[in-house]
């Protein structure tokens, strides 16, 4: 009896202790926040086990742990083991705080009157505006300032006559945007489609125009200020755009201007069309590495006129491919004026351009000096000021060439890290969707290799040729890229994996640091107190940078010969502390490419200078504890 009493007393004492630690109780004496079986609690224990006691625990890293509760974590782990996660994908995405596109179902909504959509978001338009006579629909401030934006327009304005569509400030200032236009304006007569300020200032924009204005008669499309100042997306794909059209004018003005790594693909564009009139003005100008592909563009067309003016002008590098352009066409006129005069030389490839054409006139004026012509029409081509190299770069007082695409302050010299120095601060704000790590119990059951891309896409509901499919492919491919000279790298999707990688390189006595906030971004700041990590000596370090992926994924790597600093950042006029930044200086740049942005900005060559940069918001730096 006494023994049973003592056992009961011990058990009661155990429960009491758990309640005291947990605070509010639920289901057995644990709180929702402190349940020891949650992924977050597991991560805390893992940190305490793997990192030596004198190293401060990083609440920053702990905050990125999976928000799944104990029950959901166990449930989704079992589903992952059984390859059944897709059956609960919406629930999994929401509960685990993942980055996912919504599954848009078909909509049969119709309308007979003019419609104005203002401050609208996330909609599927199917069979919308079909066979309408006259009228106009206006999309203004649509999907603006969103995070993950997905819109679908299918069979919109099909067989309509004189029907106008206006997309103004559409998808602006959003992050990861995907819009699909299928069979839009097909067989329409007259009317106009106007895209103005479309997907401007967007991170990772994607638009797909399939069978857009196919078989249209006199229906014009205008794209103005389209993907202006956008960043790193697949861009736009135009498939069978204006195919079999009659007198269809299309105008692209300020398209992709000042954008970063944006691509466009034109496939079967204007094919078999009659009297098409396409104008590309200031297309891809001032951009960074724009890539555009024209495949089977204007093939078998009749009396078409295409004009490329100030195309990819003052851009940095960039590549264009023209395959079977104006092939087998009749009386086609193509004018390239001031084409491809990029800041740094890009390349153009013309394969089968104008081949088999009759009575066509192709004119090149002030064209790029770096082009390849294969199976090119020999007759009817005029080259004026061809292969003339123009200097469009800006120069500063010391004669160094400065590329406008290298943001001031993105790269700097070690000598700038001195108290009192005024330095431009780049935009260090994290522009990726907010996500969390997955717990190790789930991530170890998910595929992650290029050989299993199909399975990965199935899990995350990424259909073929979708934006999400491209995001997944890009991330996995980059993670499998062989390391550069002297680099040790690993992609991690759980905090435990990051801890393992950092400690494998640096040992178990480590400190995790990140820049405190984003104050001072895109402004001039004053360097305050500076502290060199590990005495400011050459040291080892591990830097982890976010990769875009459904769950929180970091590309972690260690390179030799670096110095790491932490510095107070002061407001320019008041000298008040506004931030505490972490900077890393690469002392050996000999293996870097000569076209690296650091050398364009600082005016040097690989191996001749050290290069420093800040650790951006939500990126991390691991160093050996002092």
Curated annotation (Swiss-Prot):
Expression by tissue: Expressed in flowers and stems. Detected in trichomes, guard cells, root vascular tissue, root hairs, pollen sacs, sepals and styles of pistils.
UniProt domain BURP: residue ranges: 411-625
GO biological process, one term: cell wall modification involved in multidimensional cell growth
Localisation: Secreted, Extracellular space, Apoplast; Secreted, Cell wall
Presence of keyword Signal: yes
Alphabetical list of InterPro entries matching this protein: BURP_dom, PG-associated_BURP
UniProt keyword annotations, A-Z: Apoplast, Cell wall, Glycoprotein, Repeat, Secreted, Signal
Signal peptide: 1-23
One Pfam family hit: BURP
Disruption phenotype: Slightly reduced size of the plant. Atpgl1, atpgl2 and atpgl3 triple mutants produce smaller leaves and petioles.
Chain positions carrying an annotated carbohydrate: 124, 141, 277, 370, 387, 465
GO CC field: apoplast; plant-type cell wall
Domain remark in the UniProt entry: The BURP domain located at the C-terminus has not been identified in non-plant proteins. It is critical for PGL3's role in cell growth.
Function: Involved in cell size determination. May serve as a chaperone for expansins through the secretory pathway.
Note: Unlike the tomato GP1, the BURP domain of AtPGL3 is not cleaved when the protein is secreted to the cell wall.
Protein name: Polygalacturonase 1 beta-like protein 3
Native species: Arabidopsis thaliana
